[in-house]
Amino acid sequence: MPNNVTVQELVDKVRLKVLQGEDYLQRKITTSDISRPALEFAGYFKHYPAARIQLLGITETSFAKDLTHEQREEYMTKMCMPQTPCFVISTNLPIPKELKKAAEDAKIPILGTHLTSSQILSNMTSYLLERLAPRKSLHGVLVDISGVGVLITGDSGVGKSETALELVRRGHRLIADDRVEVYARDEQTLVGTAPQILKHLMEIRGIGIIDVSTLYGTGAIMPSDQISLIVHLETWTPDVQFDRLGDRGDTQTIQGVIVPKVSVPVKTGRNLAIIIESAAMNYRAETMGYDATETFDRNLNQLIKQNSERDSKNNKGSAN
């Protein structure tokens, strides 16, 4: 996973215009934080975040106009540091001539957009947060089952890829097979994708490598998906106790995000695709407020109470 993004990539993804410095678009962006210079236009550079993208909007350029030419020249030269990746000017504003010269001397590109500062700030931050997030590679298969991202894990040879292939055949979509790159979009959202070299591919023992998009169409694949549920496949053994009521509430923490987890015993004759499909549908029902285990417990307690009351009445009748 790269820990930087080039200015060229930012231009392409966020649709920025290159106003100046086309030869310098390979400069590296190493942080998703974006600076809107304010104190710098007052001459205070003690804590200047030079490694960030510098965003100038109506407020910043208007304030700069009230400065003298010498002040603008001094401050904008100081803002053009070797580690500064680029400047972005919003709302189709003109480039201050002092910045134009300082950026050219420092070989820093200046980009522009018709969007407001708030809009372009949001767009750039969202892209950079996703691109620069620390990533972890997991062994497993990621499938989207009716809108629920399910990460299937388990020992090698337990049948993860074969089960995922059956799920794809049933109309669900593959994101990654064998290796899943995951990153935390925020504290509650874990996203998975496939390494570039493995996109759309699956390895099936006895057959080899297959291209899912070629065999089943582009509707059978997705580039990435939120991981909402982990299904861990375990070889069944008599001495291992598995959850039969679904009230255990197991979870697994990945990249700081807590994800619900269910363990499914693998045994000859079990249709794992249908079981995992049901697990995903059950998870979706729970997120909508329905809990089958809770309903079962409530109905069972009601039945026990009714039987107890009936037995109590029968005992009283016998006594009379």
UniProtKB/Swiss-Prot annotation:
Residues 265-270 are annotated as: Important for the catalytic mechanism of dephosphorylation. Homohexamer. It comes from Limosilactobacillus reuteri (strain DSM 20016). The active site is at residues 139, 160, 178, 244. Pfam families: Hpr_kinase_C, Hpr_kinase_N. Its cofactor is Mg(2+). Residues 202-211 are annotated as: Important for the catalytic mechanism of both phosphorylation and dephosphorylation. This is HPr kinase/phosphorylase. The Walker A ATP-binding motif also binds Pi and PPi. One of its GO terms (molecular function) is protein serine/threonine/tyrosine kinase activity. InterPro entries: HPr(Ser)_kin/Pase, Hpr_kin/Pase_C, Hpr_kin/Pase_Hpr_N, P-loop_NTPase, Ser_kin/Pase_Hpr-like_N_sf.
